[in-house]
Amino acid sequence: MSTRAAKVLAERAIIESIYGLKVRSTEEVQDMVAANFSGKTESKTAATIRGIKIEEITYDSSKDIAKATASIVLDKFTNIDGQEMNLAGKLFRRVAFATSTPSQAGPVQAMRAAEIDAYKQLAKRVVGFTLESETTVENYILTSDVVKSKVLATMYLSEVTEYGWDSDGDAFVKMVLNVKDVGDILGLDVVNEEELIEVEGMGAQIDDFRQAQQD
């Protein structure tokens, strides 16, 4: 069961890399206190594709966690924005993890959270975001401070360069977008100060912000 699930999730990762996904995110901080932080990121994708190969599957029986590596080589493909991409035989490879034991799901769920956070960070860097701020000072004392940010974008052709977990079990995913390559693939003259945009997404097994609110 774990290996089958890992295969499907690896296929999803391939589709998100090539076809792309929609990312919607909101973040809010109140009164400059980290415990008052709230953030939510949602993603969505749907595409028809053929030719994905499962290169390798490994299974850790002690943790009931499976890892699947998927790859595909494509010449042309239409992305989420309806743009035809000339991929010229480019190889895409992604991995995914899954488990059939709920008690072991924490690490793999944290990894997915880190992946989505990386997509959000890329969207903020590439497309931009909207920020709203309201501050009130009464008699020289700060009485209210609210900052909100919003992101809504489609992302595609990003690549994962590194991933893993730290000693606390929190996950990280390093993701990169080669702006020049994207321009060449789309046949567009993309102007950007950075040719290579790199971000690192983070994912946790425990909601530290919610715990801080309860303390």
What spans do the regions from the language model cover?
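Domain-level marker for long, solvent-exposed, non-transmembrane regions
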Residues: 1-215
